[in-house]
C-alpha cells in the first residue's frame, strides 16, 4: 500500500553548512530508488510506510554525521487504506 511521507530536516549547523547537509539527505533519498519529489521546503516520498519511516530515521543520522548537533524535522504522513500517490495529488499541475 502506497503512503506519502514528507520530510523537512532542519539541522543545527552553521548557516553555510545547511545546504550541504540537506543535500546529503536528498542524495540519500535519491539513492533508495523510491518515488520522491524534492520541493523548496521538503521532500515528499511515496512507498511503504515502514520503509519510508526507516528513511526518515536515517536522514536524522546523516545530519548528525555531517556535523549537526541537533536535528529538528517536520514529518507529514498521508495514509489511507487504499493507498495514495503523489501523482493523484499534483499530477494535474505537472
Specify the residue positions occupied by each region the protein language model found.
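Charge-rich, low-complexity N-terminal segments
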Residues: 1-94
